């Protein structure tokens, strides 16, 4: 497993060098004050350099070497890293629909709207979004791809082959193609890229709709052998959309079934809770707010406490109380089984979509 050497820039300008198997998770620990004592109280913190090493031992040796650098040498290292990354920053988005638009918004926040170009089958839709965000609209898909380092394909799976055949003449070495289509593997996508001038990097991202408000859960995977700069570049571009996590491609369909489809499973639950509130006497608007805020808070408890959801449930259920009575009613009606079956059904459909 790869390890990383990273440099954090603290709010007061201090540069902190460290190692981690997962830089984003380590950064989160620093931000919570659970990282090194040298970064506590010195926020905001930003990763300004990262370097991949083959193992932990190599990372520790590289960390020791960097720590011996003078500040000017560290700054030169950071500057070189930033310059290499900036050469790959311009992003094109093919498709401006419900899933494409949140990613476009994220990229505009990450690198500036001037570094983003969009194209859409219905040009008026692309123009409306561009007017809102300040990004450019390309004449067509190929023109968008030709001017970008990252080309995001935000189209439905059944449209992907046709879109790629149109883009192939504009794609080549030094570019990264990023698909958000469910079910379509890197192997399938690579086959449709035959004829490109060179070999663009190939990655997949699976977002969800909360990305529109910066609360998304996104998965990222890539074809074997993809350079780290492309993976890190996509992470940087999409970071404003929410949490971006690297996973194995074999887990993408399962991830999509849980996190991609999951919001549509939760919304009816919130609506049903609100309906229950109305039934027992709450005004509709208040019931909806209470239900939604409760789900938001419960999710935060799971993420921030580190406790198992079952433990958190037990902490609310007192013997003979109203909460355990409600939990029992859910169990009697197959609530848990229905949720599992929903994920399984979505997973099977994702696999069907990949059979092209």
Where in this protein do the model-derived segments appear?
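NAD(P)-dependent Rossmann-like dehydrogenase/reductase catalytic/cofactor-binding core
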Residues: 292-356
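GIY-YIG nuclease catalytic motif and its immediate N-terminal context
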Residues: 1-72, 77-82
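N-terminal beta1-alpha1 ligand-phosphate binding loop
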Residues: 2-15, 91-107, 111, 120-122, ...
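Internal alpha-helical scaffold of NAD(P)-dependent oxidoreductase catalytic cores
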Residues: 188-201, 217-254, 266-304, 349
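NAD(P)+-binding Rossmann beta1-loop-alpha1 motif at the extreme N-terminus of oxidoreductases
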Residues: 88-139, 143-146, 278-280
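Rossmann-like NAD(P)(H) cofactor-binding subdomain of soluble oxidoreductases
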Residues: 103, 123, 133, 141-220
